[in-house]
């Protein structure tokens, strides 16, 4: 699972001559929605287009919208690839003359959600609109996020959901980010966000990038407790004597599995269950054979979550 990756994700930069008075916004958008993300919101996320992603969306419905958002990112991470070739194309140029609209350099168009699923690839706008469509199908309110970077003409877009007053950005891969975590993520990728805005219909809301959560030892213990319960649920017993050193009496073989995830700076307790399930899944996939007992330790060291699983048989 990739937790950090540098994207060359490009916002569709527009060069628009001021529309003539007789060209309404509706007429304009009907001609350029493939190249203008604000216009695309009404055209790509209508009921007809959203229904086309039903086969995938129904598989990603979670117990609530947080769970659905997590499952969507997980699916996108496993099934889609970033379209580097498309991202390298020049941005579209839109010219309006009276009621006539001409678009030049049309290769970097906005895909519909169903097209992105079919192609299995896209750029940031394609990921964002697919995420919004999958959320909408499952009855979850989604938002478009427009990002501007310092000293960079190239922008970026993503999706977001609101959970108990906090926006969480959904950007192609796990995990969901709170605003501060998203700011840190881009710093680590070599870019500094100058401004991020939530777009909700015709309303633009500045995103406060100082809002964030700092994971603590209490979070580590709570996650550890959840993961322990998952292992107990498989019938394997917990033995606190297992510590990777001398094998206690009653066992013939011991095994230690260590997992380091660069995700501590992005952790938020709103997604505790999803994090715990994800970590458990990663551990379970690495276990070969059957074991009688286990012990588990999870700690936070800087920006890293360290998980140590001791097994014995």
From Swiss-Prot:
It comes from the Archaea. InterPro entries: Papain-like_cys_pep_sf, Transglutaminase-like_domain. Disulfide bonds: none annotated. Gene3D superfamilies: 3.10.620.30. This is UPF0252 protein AF_0384. Belongs to the UPF0252 family.
């Amino acid at each position: 699972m990739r937790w950090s990756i540098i994207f060359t994700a490009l916002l569709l930069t527009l060069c628009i001559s001021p529309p003539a008075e007789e060209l309404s916004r509706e007429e304009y958008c009907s001609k350029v929605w493939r190249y203008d993300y604000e216009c695309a919101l009404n055209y790509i996320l209508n009921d007809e287009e959203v229904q086309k992603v039903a086969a995938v969306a129904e598989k990603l419905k979670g117990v609530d919208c947080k769970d659905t958002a997590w499952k969507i990112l997980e699916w996108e991470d496993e099934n889609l690839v970033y379209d580097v070739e498309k991202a390298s194309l020049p941005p579209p140029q839109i010219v309006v003359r009276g009621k006539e609209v001409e678009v030049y350099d049309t290769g970097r168009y906005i895909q519909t959600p169903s097209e992105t699923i079919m192609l299995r690839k896209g750029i940031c706008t394609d990921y964002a609109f697919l995420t919004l469509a999958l959320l909408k199908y499952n009855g979850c309110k989604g938002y478009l996020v427009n990002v501007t970077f310092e000293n960079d003409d190239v922008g970026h877009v993503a999706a977001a959901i609101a959970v108990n007053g906090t926006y969480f950005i959904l950007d192609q891969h796990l995990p969901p980010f709170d605003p501060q975590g998203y700011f840190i993520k881009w710093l680590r990728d070599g870019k500094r966000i100058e401004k991020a805005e939530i777009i909700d219909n015709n309303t633009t809301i500045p995103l406060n990038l100082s809002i964030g959560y700092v994971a603590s030892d209490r979070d580590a213990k709570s996650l550890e407790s959840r993961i322990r319960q998952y292992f107990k649920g498989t019938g394997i017993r917990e033995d606190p004597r297992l510590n990777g050193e001398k094998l206690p009496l009653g066992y013939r073989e011991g095994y230690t599995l260590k997992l380091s995830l660069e995700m501590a700076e992005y952790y938020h307790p709103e997604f505790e269950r999803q994090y715990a399930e994800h970590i458990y899944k990663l551990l379970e996939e690495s276990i070969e054979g059957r074991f009688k007992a286990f012990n588990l330790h999870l700690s936070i060291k800087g920006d890293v979550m360290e998980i140590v699983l001791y097994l014995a048989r």
